[in-house]
Structures are given as C-alpha cells and as structure tokens.
Amino acid sequence: MSDDNADKLTRLEEEGEIAADYLEELLDIADLDGDIEIDVENGRASVEIVADDPDALDRLVGDDGEVLDALQELTRLAVQTETGERSRLMLDIAGFRAERKEERQDITREAIARVRATGEAVKLDAMNPFERKVCHDVVAEEGLTSESEGAEPHRRVVILPEESDGE
C-alpha cells in the first residue's frame, strides 16, 4: 500500500472514530442502546449503529430515513469540526440504508429491463442523493446512461435508452 493510500485509510479510520464518539454521546442522551460499527467502504468512512432490537432505533431512522439523513449531516459536521476537513462519511442505522440500497438496485434493474424492451427513457420516483447514486451505479454497470432531473426534494433518475449509431 502506498503512503498516500495508507494516509487516506488512517484519515478515514479517524473520521469513523470521531463519528463513533459523537454518536455514542447521542445514544446516551437519547437513552438508547446500540453498538457502533466502523468500516471504510468505497473510499469513505462508514459507520453503523446496530442493536439487538433494531426496532428500538426506529426513531433515529424516521419516515423514509429523514432523521437518518439529518443525523448523517450532523455527524459529518462533528467530524469536520474536529478534523477541519469535509467528510463524506456514510451513516447507517439498523441496516436501513443497506436495505434501501438493495431495493433501489432491484427497482433500477426492473427499469433497465423496461428501457431495453421499449427503447424509451424511464423516470424513477424522486430519491435522496444516496439512493440516486445507487441507481446511477447500477445503470453504469449495465452499460446504459442515466441522468438526474428536477430539484430537491423531487430530484429523480432518468434511465436513457441505448443510442443507436445508425448502423
């Protein structure tokens, strides 16, 4: 591993530790039981709050993950305050994001099949930035093109048909 990669890994692990400390304080204040798991995935720190009873963490997820998104931003700010650098840390609670990622991948694959069958673009429902990235990644893996359209919170992914080159 090069020194640059080792330095980046160390920095991301530090981000995870700072985030874990912040989130442990939050759990104490909210009187919630949970464990913090820290990892580095896809070039970013990844932190998850897990519990023996995942339903006990529902309040930290909120409807459609709104509270989770807010907590992620607050956690990123806590990391930035400590390190002086912007964080791209990902926070998951009780597997909510992992489950949503799988759902979005399935929805995207179904939409890709419709695009290929009809030759017409397919617009997906509005999603948050994390979910849109999941969709864009699946579309790219399948060799098609996608774009985002609209303004938050109604921003959506559009999957485009393959362009024929006239042959």
Where are these regions (language model features)?
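RNA-contacting regions in translation and RNA-metabolism proteins
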Residues: M1-E167
